[in-house]
Amino acid sequence: MNHSPQSARPVSIMRRFLDSEAAGGITLMAAAALALIVANSPFAQTYFDALHLYIGPLSLAHWINDALMAIFFLLVGLEIKREMLDGQLASWPNRMLPGIAAAGGVILPAIIFAVLNHDNPAKLRGWAVPSATDIAFALGVLSLLGSRAPSSLKVFLATLAILDDLAAVVIIAIFYTAEISMPYLGAAFITAAVLFVMNRMGVVKLLPYLISAVILWFFVFNSGVHATVAGVVAALMIPLKPAPGRPDDMTSPLHKLEHALAKPVAFIVVPIFGFANAGISFKGLEASVLGDTLTLGILLGLFLGKQFGVFGAAWLAIKTGLAEKPMGASWVQLYGVAILCGIGFTMSIFIGLLSFPSDLMQTETKIGVLSGSALSAICGYLLLRAAARPKRG
């Protein structure tokens, strides 16, 4: 039976959307906006009750933040390994500019936050919240410019965001770890060792790695180290090279898994996280929250700290000859991308949830992240759009 062009058109439009670079960011924005609407609607109580509903040993919110997000971190780990061994980060010259820029973008926001909250140890726990960049959001905004943004800028932003994610993973593992259970931690190390041995022995079937990854998650979760770290550790053990002597299957296990996870993470995992965590009820919320040093520290850290930290470090690296400016990109365009780095959404909220147990502080964190990310997205897009306009005359 032949389908008419009219009936096929919606399918092709949807397929083009899912394949576009902007799709993940747009879906995440829609999920966050929907969460804000629901949290301030007659369905608000149902929304919050559902998140606190216990399913087995954990609430729904904890299943999302501890288990579902481990899949997100598994994909992050796969991307980091691929880029470090066989991509944009495979050589030191390619690592220099995004690496130095990422360092500036982690350090300056943390300093701004610490200056505003140095006298409050409870708030100071959130120093790392404004140090993250949301790769899906940032690339989604940049991709809205299409061919008007040089491809070198997209590579720079993607590479910087991956290094940013790596820094966030290290920060979570070191600074946001609860009391350690040595038996579970020991079991986690043994499981990681099994994964490593499988890699060295040339095991290329994904199933043993995935089963071991689930076991690793269980042990890490119970050890006190944040469970999402298990996703990254498991990813680093997945083989990058395809099976030897198999000309019919030249795709490596890492590429297979990365390809299989890309769309589910972009369109299911991250939007669910966004919907579950972006819901802020403004009912009874005092205006003073906006002026609180916790909210301001995150907002200014993301909006000002990120752009000045990333651009300042990149400018210094280029001017001193340590790195080269992205090909075909102007200084204004590089600055616009630096502003986009202030879109911290997913990782910033995630670190905020680890930092603060109180609902009020989590709400202030989310307001700071949402406002700082929105300002960065709007200003970065407008500057890049203006910089891409053809000059008249």
Swiss-Prot record:
Main location: membrane
Keyword Cell membrane in annotation: yes
GO CC term (a single one): plasma membrane
Pfam families: Na_H_antiport_1
Transmembrane parts of this sequence: 23-43, 58-78, 96-116, 126-146, 155-175, 178-198, 201-221, 224-244, 265-285, 298-318, 334-354, 367-387
Superkingdom per UniProt: Bacteria
Catalytic activity: Na(+)(in) + 2 H(+)(out) = Na(+)(out) + 2 H(+)(in)
Listed InterPro entries: Na/H_antiporter_dom_sf, NhaA
Membrane protein topology class: Multi-pass membrane protein
Subcellular location: Cell inner membrane
Record's keyword terms, sorted: Antiport, Cell inner membrane, Cell membrane, Ion transport, Membrane, Sodium, Sodium transport, Transmembrane, Transmembrane helix, Transport
Any one GO molecular function term: sodium:proton antiporter activity
A Gene Ontology biological process term: regulation of pH
Family: Belongs to the NhaA Na(+)/H(+) (TC 2.A.33) antiporter family.
Protein's job: Na(+)/H(+) antiporter that extrudes sodium in exchange for external protons.
Matching PANTHER family: NA(+)_H(+) ANTIPORTER NHAA (PTHR30341:SF0), SODIUM ION/PROTON ANTIPORTER NHAA-RELATED (PTHR30341)
Protein name in UniProt: Na(+)/H(+) antiporter NhaA
Native species: Brucella canis (strain ATCC 23365 / NCTC 10854 / RM-666)
